[in-house]
Amino acid sequence: MPEEITEAVTAVREALPDANIGIHTHNDSGFAVANTIAAVKAGARQVQGTINGIGERCGNANLITLIPVLMLKYGCETGVAKEKLHRLKSLSRMLDNRINRLPNAHAPYVGDAAFAHKGGLHASAAIRDPRTYEHIPPETVGNSREYVVSDQSGKANFIARFDELGIAVDKDDPHLDTLIAEVKDCLLYTSDAAD
């Protein structure tokens, strides 16, 4: 657990102040990235991890998550140039493709859902100011913002999707409400829970 890692790294640093401490974590409890961050904050200077966290048992610290966290959230030097962070998503996808594995749509930073806005109010706020729901600009890590049309969508989602297609639609167009109702009705029948 992160607090145990902090205690252990702190103890080693006190006993061996000149040592270059490293950390190698596994994700058996889902804490590989958090434990690695705790170690770095406590003084570890060498981090071991893998692309997409692939490793034995439940995997290792995911460098695709860890690198932007350390650089963008903690201001750490990682050896990766900031102007190359935009290659993280393509690197993640390349490995998944090579090992014939579907990408994790919910992966932090690089997953397709990481910057997807599904709910109507959520999308409306994100359109006005993406910082309301996005912790970084998605382009920083090679990702992109998406406004999803779903059963939770409002006008903002639909208008954003039309804009992407080059179609101008006024938010007060009465046909828009009809379209939204029909799409939501159709989506009800595509759910796994539908009878």
Where are these regions (language model features)?
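Mobile "lid/hinge" segments at catalytic clefts and subdomain interfaces of large enzymes
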Residues: 54, 60-73, 113-167
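Conserved small/polar residues in nucleotide/adenosyl-binding loops
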Residues: 189-195
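Alpha-helix-loop-beta-strand connector modules within alpha/beta enzyme cores
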Residues: 7-21
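Phosphate/diphosphate-binding loops
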Residues: 77-112
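Hydrophobic faces of well-ordered beta-strands that scaffold small-molecule active sites
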Residues: 21-25, 47-49
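Terminal amphipathic helices with adjacent charged low-complexity linkers/tails
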Residues: 171-188
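Glycine-rich phosphate-binding active-site loops on the catalytic face of alpha/beta enzymes
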Residues: 45-59
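Catalytic cores of alpha/beta
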Residues: 31-42
